[in-house]
């Protein structure tokens, strides 16, 4: 394949940041087709036991996902994000870098999470906002 460049093109030298972490996938995890999981840059990327990651999801570097969490198709999780246990992230949801999502959280389909989410919260929208706190007690 040939490369043809037209006028006013600037090509910059690529800087490579070393990634020393790993991807740790615990027991009973399901990962569907076309998913990408980036290895950690300074710490590991961790997928917790019993988690289900559906088709075409992207999980960036240094992400930690708790146990029994479900990411529906085309979910994108930004770098250094922490997702708790027993969470459900709806189809095509997007999580910004460095977000903390508590345990038992539901993120509505198509939502864009740009703020941390407390335990047992249901959020939806762009940007995602709290709809209801779940109390299982």
Question: Where does each model-flagged region fall?
Answer:
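Structural signal for interior beta-strand "rungs" in well-ordered beta-sheet cores
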Residues: 1-124, 128-131
């Amino acid at each position: 394949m040939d490369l043809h460049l037209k006028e006013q093109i600037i090509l910059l030298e690529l800087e490579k940041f070393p990634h020393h972490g790993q991807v740790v996938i615990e027991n009973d995890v399901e990962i569907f087709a076309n998913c990408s999981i980036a290895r950690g840059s300074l710490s590991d990327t961790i997928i917790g036991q019993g988690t289900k990651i559906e088709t075409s999801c992207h999980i960036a570097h240094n992400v930690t996902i708790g146990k029994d969490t479900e990411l529906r198709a085309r979910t994108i999780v930004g770098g250094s994000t922490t997702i708790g246990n027993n969470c459900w992230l709806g189809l095509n949801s997007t999580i910004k870098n460095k977000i903390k999502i508590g345990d038992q959280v539901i993120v509505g389909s198509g939502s864009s999470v740009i703020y941390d989410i407390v335990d047992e919260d249901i959020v939806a929208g762009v940007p995602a906002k709290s709809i209801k706190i779940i109390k299982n007690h």
